[in-house]
């Protein structure tokens, strides 16, 4: 009995903590599916977590991780910002953003003299030609219908600018002429004439006389009033002399 029990105990495996079971092997399809899910689910963050796990498994990994974290801010931007890493799907918005930044330059159309004459002739008739007129004109001048339509749009804008400038200049000229006419028609008050100092001194000396005193040495031109006063004074003087002379002559009886 003892030998049989001992043999049974030797055949039974010993119970205790053993090594973990190995991971299941993945085929090529499983690897592709795992890589696809990996790239969609924030590739960069998951790679950092896996790298941190591998560093923790090695001795001295914490010191190396600290040194790498200290060098990363001073070293500049990470490689993930400069270029996509291996396995990262390129963003579809990068190419479109670069294309939007490069603004396409539109080719300008140069019209010759014959084309401009034909376009101006039609513009004199109508400022808004319909599609049939534009197509016919485009065939005549060897241009596209879109170019003809753009030319008419620009020509209408230029015509409106010229009209506004003409109206502004005309209104300014009318306002200027009206202000000049109003200034001419406004009555002007007569200015008082300045009195000469000779007249003021004469009125102060003889207030009752209306004729200024005659001065023989004056070189000014004689006025009619002054001549009349002089003649009256001379006549009076002669009459007085005649009366004196007649009174002195003795009478004969």
From Swiss-Prot:
Belongs to the paired homeobox family. This is Paired mesoderm homeobox protein 2. It is found in: Nucleus. Residues 97-108 have a biased composition (Basic residues). Coiled coil: none annotated. Its main location: nucleus. Keywords: Developmental protein, DNA-binding, Homeobox, Nucleus. A motif (OAR) lies at residues 230-243. Residues 61-70 have a biased composition (Basic and acidic residues). It comes from Homo sapiens (Human). The keyword Nucleus applies. Residues 1-15, 71-84 have a biased composition (Low complexity). May play a role in the scarless healing of cutaneous wounds during the first two trimesters of development.
